């Protein structure tokens, strides 16, 4: 995707426009094993993103522990947000294994994923790791997931991002597909 003058930033009293450029390549595998009863799934993607000079955006579920005071600057020390979009490159990989379903059609699927990003705005690589299990019921119409996450934290100090301690997260979710 390319779009001229899609983004802007201020330099002094001037408004400077820059293009948006997004490129990616991805591979996907979904292969049945053991006479189709087990399934291995893999995905890998590399993404080059140009949102303009030093663009960086945090993403995370809204959290009352995060301040609404803009003077506090960017921080990932509270809440669960981390840098997810920015000018730079990202490599994302995911591997999952689904075990054979039981007689009621329920099955477990374990998975792990890793995201490593090299953003222009941060001196250090951003590495996020997830691992978890899905419990699939009713031919994947109902799903309970338990996800463990390990992510970096950063503090903004004098215009520079400083690495903080890594933080853990645990998410339990339920999804139901209506037909």
Predicted features, each with a name:
Residues 1-120:
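Detector for outer-membrane/organellar transmembrane beta-barrel domains
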Residues 20-24, 90-92, 126-130, 167-171:
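Transmembrane beta-barrel architecture of outer-membrane proteins
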Residues 26-28, 94-96, 132-134, 147, ...:
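Outer-membrane beta-barrel architecture
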Residues 57-67, 126-130, 161-166:
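Flexible, surface-exposed loop regions and adjacent strand-edge segments
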Residues 112-115, 127-130, 149-150:
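Small/polar glycine-rich anion-binding or flexible loop at a beta-alpha turn
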Residues 119-122, 155-157:
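A generic structural signal for short coil/turn motifs at secondary-structure boundaries
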Residues 134-167:
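Internal helix-turn-beta structural module
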Residues 165-179:
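Outer-membrane beta-barrel "beta-signal"
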